Amino acid sequence: MHQKSIEEAKKRLFSGELVIFPTETVYGIGGNANNHKSIELIYKTKNRPINNPLICHFANIREIEKNFVLKDKDYELANTFWPGPLTLILEKNKQSLISPLLSNNKNHVGCRIPNNEISLSLLSILDFPIAAPSANIATRTSATSIKNLDYKLKEIFYIDGGSSVLGLESTVIQTTNNGCKILRLGSLTIEDIKMKFPKYEINIEQSNVSPGNQLKHYSPIKPIRINVDFIKKNETLLNFGVNKLTSNIKNLNLSIKGNLSDASYNFYNYLNILDNTNCSGIAVAPIPDQGLGKTINDRLKRASYKDDK
């Protein structure tokens, strides 16, 4: 069904152009990870700071092994959660062809194998990985469908794969001797990891080798208030579960049943809808701070960040 689009994307990537493609998490805007000019074009197109690294997408673990060193715990996580929303921070080997520009000249790079038929089909016919951040303008909300793309990005060739099935970015992890460090919360939860590896020591940390750690990030254009217990007159409402909160303009509920997987799936789409509503701002109901709720709250905290300087 998408074969012609995949072949066209291949041609464009080989010529140094960018393409927008679906993954199970969010849509990515990608280029040849070995091509310096393609990497520069990604940063320029997104208006993305060069100190915010990119993630490399691969078809299989053999391709990753050609460029990176994997330790025992890297293999444990990879064999359990790939393909899927896991990004592993790995050290480049001496044979690596990966452009240093995508990691701001650091020797560690985020790598993942997406769990999406279209992206895997595309990656399997390339002889290079795809470097791809989320398909948005820097600091803005991620896109989980083509209709969510910023108008500035719709001129770029894209493959329409429908809505992303998970709706939140991948979890960025760096392994340690005793477990792992989570450098960016994502669709793979701490509980998911603990269920498979109960003896792992898991810590949440920040690092400049991981994307997504800017104070202001994942943000709609309209101002946003989180953990609200009342709605202002001209605000829309992003609700969760059953409560008495209501907006006189527009109400969207991430999950009336209080299901965090449903909330994740709807999150960016609903934020985009409310952001395009005639209102003064977006009020967001409290989200349980567990499982995927912890990831949603991380995104909301960054989305609502105000620089008071």
Model-found features: residue ranges?
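Active-site-adjacent structural elements in enzyme catalytic cores
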Residues: M1-K309
